[in-house]
Amino acid sequence: MKIHFITEGASCLSSLVAALSPVHEVSESGSVSEISPSIEAVVIGEHVSPTHPQWQQAQALGLPIYSYGAFLYELHKMKTRVVIAGTQGRSEIAAMVLHTMDYFSKKIDYFLESPIGNIPTCKYSPEAEFVLIEGGDTLSPIEQVPMFQLYRPTLALISHIESGKEKQYADFINTLTKGGILLYNEEDAALKVLAESTENQLRLMPYETAPHQESGGTTYLITPEGEMPLMISGKEQMNYLSGAKWLCQNLGIDEQDFYEAIETFK
């Protein structure tokens, strides 16, 4: 597939270009002359204006034009799409999930909005069954809706909702595929109300902060097998860990295996 990206400084899209290069014929930004009738998809970065010369040229040629959110859906529509959403904790939960999948050498595609430690922002392989997407609420330049409403996930997790953004997240919940799974932090009162009042036909899975205790400067996770020392600390991190655990269990990692992997997470 021949794809052109108009990135305008969006580093996450530049990473996507690099990830797709071994599989597709891709180009990035450049001049108007690069927009030709042979291009099969033009992907627009979140900060690109409709007056951008390349966007206008693509429209003049009648080329398929996608926001990057819509393109990610098209790219992964035959895979199980997993979205981590929420106004805080997205990247932390994503990091825990990716650490666990890597620990057990499980293949998973992913797309992150910003770097997490040494983890690249994007990975793509045609063989992976799952794709994990960090679902931010930046406005799409084409659809004029928050980007995370374009992914149509089968499995989603919402960590927290900032006051005033309830409608955005209610609309997001309605974009999950029917019969899909919604994991949500039930300690967030507004989120709990949204999840439990949705009319979408979903399997609801609430989670809460993982039981733990602090001793001698170390956090110990309380598990069915006893206390386990961790390399992370703090109640928020324990809440994120709980969400990551349930997400991993829905990706085929059982509870005991998750504990084995998360013990080395930092």
Q: Residue spans of the language-model regions?
A:
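Walker A (P-loop) phosphate-binding motif
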Residues: M1-E8, C12, L16-A19, Y68-I116
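Active-site beta-alpha connecting loops in nucleotide-dependent enzymes
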Residues: H4-V17, S21, E25, E162-K165, ...
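Conserved beta-strand positions in the Rossmann-like core of class I SAM-dependent methyltransferases
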Residues: E25-S27, D109
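Acidic, Mg2+-coordinating active-site environments of NTP-dependent enzymes
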Residues: S29, E34-Y66, Y73-K79, L98, ...
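Glycine/threonine-rich beta-strand-loop-alpha-helix active-site module
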Residues: K107-L132
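A short, acidic/glycine-rich surface segment
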Residues: G117-P120, L139-Q144, S215
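A generic local secondary-structure boundary/capping motif
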Residues: I119-K123, Q144-F148, D171-I173
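Switch II (G3) loop of P-loop NTPases
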Residues: E129-I142
